[in-house]
Design a protein with these regions (language model features):
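Short inter-helical turns and helix N-cap capping residues of alpha-solenoid HEAT/ARM repeat scaffolds
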Residues: 41-42, 80-84, 132-133
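Positions within ordered alpha-helical repeat solenoids
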Residues: 55-59, 77, 81, 93-103, ...
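N-terminal "cap/leader" segments of large eukaryotic alpha-helical scaffolds
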Residues: 1-46
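HEAT-repeat alpha-solenoid elements in large eukaryotic scaffold proteins
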Residues: 5-13, 43-56, 91-104
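Core helices of alpha-solenoid repeat scaffolds
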Residues: 27-32, 67-72, 114-122
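Buried hydrophobic core positions in alpha-solenoid tandem helical repeats
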Residues: 33-35, 74-76, 124-126, 158
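Flexible loop/turn segments at the boundaries of HEAT repeats in alpha-solenoid HEAT proteins
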Residues: 20-24, 60-68, 99-115, 151-155
């Protein structure tokens, strides 16, 4: 089942032209490999991939890169099945998506869309905010605070 899930994810990842997106390190052509590793069965490799994604997509919470937008749905899918340790790392990435601005070198119409997509995932964060794992709960609450109740109210009107 996991193999089929990862194969479907790989097909979906390959349908995106990652070369048009940027990371902190340049073009995002390496991001799909990291997402596949994040979703894989090897916990150590997944944890390493989470760190690399954190550095590349929301560069140490200093700024967010355009590759965050196409990465988001895949990262959210992985979060749904992640253990607590991996969930903490993924939530840290997602917090970066919620709080970081761009590095200022590019026009960033995608940033508003990224924030809207993070806001649409609020039910996941609400569920995780009551996790028995205090760190998971902390990050989920932090994301909810950053996306704000005003944004959630606007979503309910849509």
């Amino acid at each position: 089942m996991v193999l089929q899930k990862n194969k479907a994810m790989t097909v979906d990842l390959e349908s995106i032209d990652w070369a048009v997106f940027k990371t902190a390190y340049g073009t995002a052509t390496f991001v799909p490999k990291l997402i596949v590793q994040l979703a894989g069965n090897n916990h150590e490799i997944a944890m390493g991939a989470s760190h690399e994604l954190w550095c590349a997509l929301c560069h140490q919470h200093a700024y967010v890169s355009s590759a965050a937008l196409p990465s988001l749905p895949f990262i959210l899918k992985v979060l749904d099945g992640a253990n607590d340790a991996l969930s903490v790392e993924i939530l840290d990435i997602l917090l970066g998506f919620a709080v970081c601005e761009t590095d200022g070198t590019e026009n960033a119409p995608w940033l508003e869309q990224l924030r809207a997509e993070v806001t649409r995932a609020h039910r996941r964060f609400r569920a995780l905010s009551s996790s028995q794992n205090e760190t998971v709960a902390y990050f989920a609450v932090a994301i909810l605070e950053k996306i704000g109740e005003k944004n959630l109210e606007m979503l309910q009107l849509l």
